[in-house]
Each structure stands twice: as structure tokens, then as C-alpha cells.
């Protein structure tokens, strides 16, 4: 596989909000967009299901997810790496 082929896959950064499923985590992605009329920045969010082969990511972890082929009906992203572990209280 060439470098050009790997750079076409989208990557997103977000927080794990659920890890209750087997080999799947739910990742919340938040984007700040400017309102077209009022100019105020609004936080838009979306949840993605991502594949976690080893069940190693916990709630609160900051992760990077990469687009992949569809793995199930709702899952077409794979957790590529851990950016920041969640703080334990």
C-alpha cells in the first residue's frame, strides 16, 4: 500500500463515552462551527461506533479513530491509537 492510499482515510479525534459493547467503543466527536447569521460559535457533536479489538480503551480516553470498511451495520471506524488516558479519580 502506498502513502497516497493511506492518507485518503479520514481520521477524527474524540473521547470514548461508552465501552460496554464487546470489541466496540462509542466515540464522541465535537466540532466548533460558526453560526452563519449570528457569528456565535456552536459546538456540534456526533457519536461514532469504533472497533476496539482488545477491549483496551476506557470511558474518558482521548482516542484517534480511522475510517475503514464496514465492520457491522453501525461500525465503520477503527480506533487507531490512544492520545490521552482518562484520569482516575
Curated annotation (Swiss-Prot):
Q: Which InterPro entries match?
A: NA-bd_OB-fold, Ribosomal_uS17, Ribosomal_uS17_bact/chlr, Ribosomal_uS17_CS
Indicate yes or no for the key word Ribosomal protein: yes
* Record Pfam families: Ribosomal_S17
Q: Name one GO biological process term.
A: translation
Which UniProt keywords are given for this protein, alphabetically ordered?
Ribonucleoprotein, Ribosomal protein, RNA-binding, rRNA-binding
Q: Which Gene3D superfamilies match?
A: Nucleic acid-binding proteins (2.40.50.140)
What are its GO cellular component terms? cytosolic small ribosomal subunit
Which GO molecular function terms does the record list?
A: rRNA binding; structural constituent of ribosome
Please tell me whether the keyword Ribosomal protein is annotated for this protein: yes
Q: What this chain does, per the record?
A: One of the primary rRNA binding proteins, it binds specifically to the 5'-end of 16S ribosomal RNA.
Q: Which PANTHER family match?
A: 40S RIBOSOMAL PROTEIN S11 FAMILY MEMBER, SMALL RIBOSOMAL SUBUNIT PROTEIN US17M
Assembly, per entry:
Part of the 30S ribosomal subunit.
Matches recorded under NCBIfam families = PRK05610.1, uS17_bact
Spell out the family assignment given in the record's similarity comment: Belongs to the universal ribosomal protein uS17 family.
Name it: Small ribosomal subunit protein uS17
Q: Identify the coding gene.
A: rpsQ
